[in-house]
């Protein structure tokens, strides 16, 4: 296949055009007075959202070179979302600002490699200052404030704070779609462990790439399954019951996994396989925890049990299981409550007796999984479109809150990024390296500028006035007031702000140092096919 090439300014200009098209779409959503974007779906109602990464992933540009620029920004948003769970719009705005300012200097003759060095130095100084300004999350009210800002909804903030209060900051919180219009919180007994599905073909929800099993059986073993014949009897028993099956095993090798996948895709049975959590003795203990929680038996040679002889009575059961590529969450296991309570007491005793900090930490993790439960936020709305939009907001708010618990929080509304400018300006370098530093200094103003413009104000006026304020004071676009941002509860997680800046700087530096771009040549439309019909001379 022939390729099309562009070099130097031509290449960078085309990619910048793509960056601008995507960023101009995404940045309209930033701030309390940001707008929504409507995304067409291949089927069903359109999606209305203000979630940066969702918008970025939906954009495909016709021009191959512009599309590459757009995809680089989408990667910034996606990476920020993966690390911090929020801040995708901020990352996009920062990327556009760094690329725009950087390319002006490259076009004027600056050395892109020098600019990249300056960008990296400035980013490191900004991140160090962000950590210095960061406040730790100590109270339920602070958690509620952070969640409320991210979701732009106080009620949601209170709900997330309540959920984290009930299951702990590291507890499992899932977000479900409700059949009603109210958004509610339920805490159910459950357990999560860090193993996901063995094959992506086992998913039941292709949009989220996750598998959901309702009222499934659970086969728990520390053995490797290499031959499908080993588990065929129990598979047949499960199929006869018309139920789904989760297999937790040391590994599934040979022809066993492809056979399970093939039968799943054909609809013969609904099965998901995951690897057993932990290693060595800890693995055995965790499998026993799962067995007690679900009312099953661990199929292990230690007990003289064989896979071929497994009966349906030895399988665990649960109300619901959610499996992603990284985690498995078991909700409402059918185990005996007395047995679970006894297991919890045993683990507590082991925690009291152990002298190893590492062992104590692992035991506390097991205790939290057995006793902590799972908080479920049931999202309600009047329409399907509103439901999706609200669910996106709550997911972002939960991610932002977890990030704040992890690394603390700073003044929100882009204020912290302007506050770090003084620390970055203190850097003194020569030539193009200093130009790179100045590029980041100007870009740090861009989120506040855009928040102000979305509120119908002149961005430059707000930025200049903000620079005159003492650290932590900023502009509240929701009320059109200048306030102490932290006292007013307008805060951003440090991790979100840091990740947005680091990812934006990283990809922008790569784009600025691009000298050639290679793309597929546009394909001519194929001629229309002749209509189907019989052979000449046939009736």
UniProtKB/Swiss-Prot annotation:
Compartments, record wording: Cytoplasm
Enzymatic class: isomerase
GO cellular component: cytoplasm
Reactions performed catalytically: ATP + H2O + a folded polypeptide = ADP + phosphate + an unfolded polypeptide
Domain of life: Bacteria
GO biological process: protein refolding
InterPro entries recorded: Chaperonin_Cpn60_CS, Cpn60/GroEL, Cpn60/GroEL/TCP-1, GroEL-like_apical_dom_sf, GROEL-like_equatorial_sf, TCP-1-like_intermed_sf
Keywords from the UniProt entry: ATP-binding, Chaperone, Cytoplasm, Isomerase, Nucleotide-binding
Binding site for ATP: 29-32, 86-90, 413, 476-478, 492
GO molecular function: ATP binding; ATP-dependent protein folding chaperone; isomerase activity; unfolded protein binding
E.C. no: 5.6.1.7
Record PANTHER family: 60 KDA HEAT SHOCK PROTEIN, MITOCHONDRIAL (PTHR45633)
Similarity comment text for this entry: Belongs to the chaperonin (HSP60) family.
Subunit description: Forms a cylinder of 14 subunits composed of two heptameric rings stacked back-to-back. Interacts with the co-chaperonin GroES.
Chain's role: Together with its co-chaperonin GroES, plays an essential role in assisting protein folding. The GroEL-GroES system forms a nano-cage that allows encapsulation of the non-native substrate proteins and provides a physical environment optimized to promote and accelerate protein folding.
Protein name, as recorded: Chaperonin GroEL
The organism of origin for this protein: Leuconostoc mesenteroides subsp. mesenteroides (strain ATCC 8293 / DSM 20343 / BCRC 11652 / CCM 1803 / JCM 6124 / NCDO 523 / NBRC 100496 / NCIMB 8023 / NCTC 12954 / NRRL B-1118 / 37Y)
